[in-house]
């Protein structure tokens, strides 16, 4: 199975992947486990 990150919209309207969030907030991240 593959791990894909959830996406969130920023104030500027840009979308960043959860992988970038991990660098800032550590393990406070949710991922979807895709089989």
Swiss-Prot record:
Gene Ontology terms for molecular function: electron transfer activity; FMN binding
The record's keywords, sorted A to Z, are: Electron transport, Flavoprotein, FMN, Transport
Keyword Transferase in the entry? The reply is no
Q: Return the InterPro entries for the record.
A: Flavodoxin/NO_synth, Flavodoxin_CS, Flavoprotein-like_sf
Q: Which PROSITE patterns match?
A: FLAVODOXIN, FLAVODOXIN_LIKE
Q: Cell inner membrane among the record's keywords?
A: no
Kindly list the cofactors needed: FMN
Every Flavodoxin-like domain range = 4-35
Q: What's its job?
A: Low-potential electron donor to a number of redox enzymes.
Q: Which family does it belong to?
A: Belongs to the flavodoxin family.
For this entry, the protein name equals: Flavodoxin
What organism is this sequence from?
Answer: Nostoc sp. (strain MAC)
